[in-house]
């Protein structure tokens, strides 16, 4: 049986549902999600193998105007991910106006000479007339190979999206073993799970100023996994909020994270967390790279 594979970048502004779409395509949670912008910081590969075809979906950070060294890294990650792939999926919301982020991404796609499909997400939230207006507006802006309305939340249209992606697969060996669903190391997945809980449990700027480092990841003879994690924040006042009164907030975050860590690992996990301050780490090239945000 001849095998085929396709590298497919998923890009868009923050909070359009790129990670939700990636998770739905893969069939399991490999990318963290939250209701806050800039949830995704790294490029994450979600791998889907169907019969003789393997799709490698590259979930990217939301495209935005960078204001920190970390932001620069995230924006550069998007730019680099659009180049040299088989297909780019531009994910947008069903809003008639085209924003500056979408305009910027269309220019990046045009410069890459890469085939592109427009994916209009969240169609479960709009009327048909609005959807038709969105399609017309984007059709004038760029010659997309296809325009596909979907709902990553309900799965409506996702199977058709996968079928369209199959047209861009190239003959050759699979890029990953057929039982693999992500290229992320387990330590990175654990760190991202903890960061997701920070995003859900904390307000305003505090979670955006956090980073998570896994300092211990070991498996006992009985299969139980011990994980030590350090949560870094930018201010001493933020540290107090993360820990909470008598440690209540940190306990809540850790408990929620442990449940998802166990789901991913398929075994019991003992998770221990600490909180430390690294002032303005997002504007330090050294610390941004030290926390795993590197090319």
Walk through the language-model features, giving the residues of each.
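Conserved glycine(s) of the Walker
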Residues: 17, 157, 249
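Conserved G1/Walker A P-loop phosphate-binding module
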Residues: 1-76, 80-83
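Conserved C-terminal guanine-recognition region of P-loop GTPase G domains, centered on the G4
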Residues: 49, 76-147, 218-221
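Catalytic P-loop NTPase motifs of RecA-like helicase/translocase cores
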Residues: 40, 64-65, 97-98, 126-127, ...
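Conserved, well-folded catalytic cores of nucleic-acid-processing
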Residues: 28, 47-51, 66, 81, ...
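Active-site glycine-centered loops adjacent to acidic/histidine catalytic or metal-binding residues
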Residues: 59, 121, 151
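P-loop NTP-binding site
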Residues: 186-295
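Canonical P-loop GTPase G-domain recognition
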Residues: 115, 124-182, 186
């Amino acid at each position: 049986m001849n095998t085929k594979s396709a590298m497919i970048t998923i890009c868009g502004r923050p909070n359009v549902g790129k990670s939700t779409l990636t998770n739905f395509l893969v069939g399991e949670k490999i990318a963290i999600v939250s209701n806050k912008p800039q949830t995704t910081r790294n490029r994450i590969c979600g791998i889907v193998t169907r019969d003789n075809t393997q799709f490698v979906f590259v979930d990217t950070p939301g495209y935005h105007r960078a204001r920190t060294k970390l932001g620069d890294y995230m924006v550069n990650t998007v730019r680099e991910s659009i180049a040299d792939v088989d297909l780019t999926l531009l994910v947008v919301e069903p809003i008639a106006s085209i924003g500056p982020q979408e305009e910027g991404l269309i220019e990046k796609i045009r410069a890459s000479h890469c085939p592109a499909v427009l994916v209009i997400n969240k169609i479960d939230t709009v009327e048909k007339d609005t959807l038709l207006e969105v399609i017309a507006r984007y059709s004038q802006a760029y010659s997309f190979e296809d325009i596909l309305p979907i709902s990553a939340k309900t799965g409506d249209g996702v199977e058709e999206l996968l079928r369209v992606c199959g047209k861009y697969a190239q003959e050759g060996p699979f890029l990953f073993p057929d039982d693999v669903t992500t290229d992320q190391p387990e330590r990175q997945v654990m760190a991202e799970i903890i960061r997701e809980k920070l995003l859900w449990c904390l307000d305003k700027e505090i979670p955006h100023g956090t980073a998570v480092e896994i300092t211990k990841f070991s498996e006992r003879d009985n299969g139980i996994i011990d994980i030590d994690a350090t949560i870094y924040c930018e201010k001493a006042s933020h540290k107090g909020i993360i820990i909470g009164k008598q440690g209540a907030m940190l306990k809540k975050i850790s408990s929620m994270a442990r449940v998802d860590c166990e789901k991913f690992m398929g075994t019991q996990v003992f998770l221990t967390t600490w909180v430390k301050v690294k002032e303005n780490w997002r504007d330090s090239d050294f610390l941004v790279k030290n926390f795993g945000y590197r090319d």
